[in-house]
């Protein structure tokens, strides 16, 4: 979900190659408390700009023959796009379980998912579309188009939450050091340990958790607490 629009001017510039990143607009909703916007937590935007190419111009450019083909040599205007990424709250009813009777061809119980979005996520999408349009309007964009595709679980995520951290072994798989409560010499440091990553990319957090867990494991090994 998000919006895009035409940015007038800058026709003397053209992109060559691709940069390794686009632009990012950090979360601004509910940062210092409840903003009264009808939902908790928030969202951020990823985005970028590009000049419209011939593959899009060919369907909107009038003409025929050589004149028409020559007109496609000139790239179209710059277009700015903003795509929103919101947090999915860690609902207890969203689960991953092992099936009680069904097994795969190796005899291992099949994974069974139960997942659905809540009203909080739907409100995120409504608001982030409105705000994307407002930002593009404030930037002077024209021909603004908003979009909100159907919400599909797993379409743009980092999988997490299947072995969450917690102090109580009855409520969590891991302790605060990413160590399995029921197996002291086993550590889990990927996204399974986190029940939410806010609305940002958690990859660096995974790396930090892994470094911390490895350091703790070495300390425990040297102390003879684990083998």
What are these regions (language model features)?
Residues 1-80, 84, 222-227:
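Mid-to-C-terminal "cap/lid" subdomains and adjacent gly/pro-rich loops that border
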Residues 19-20, 97, 175, 200-201:
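Composition- and surface-driven signal marking solvent-exposed, interaction-prone regions
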Residues 95-99, 103-107:
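Loop/helix patches that line or flank the sugar-binding groove of alpha-linked glycan CAZymes
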Residues 8-10, 28-31, 85-89, 101-103, ...:
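Generic structural motif
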Residues 132-142, 209-226:
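Internal hydrophobic alpha-helix adjacent to the cofactor/substrate pocket in enzyme cavities
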Residues 75-88, 93, 108-119, 123-196, ...:
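A glycine-rich dinucleotide-binding beta-alpha-beta segment and adjacent secondary-structure elements
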Residues 196-215:
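A conserved FAD-binding loop/helix module that cradles the flavin
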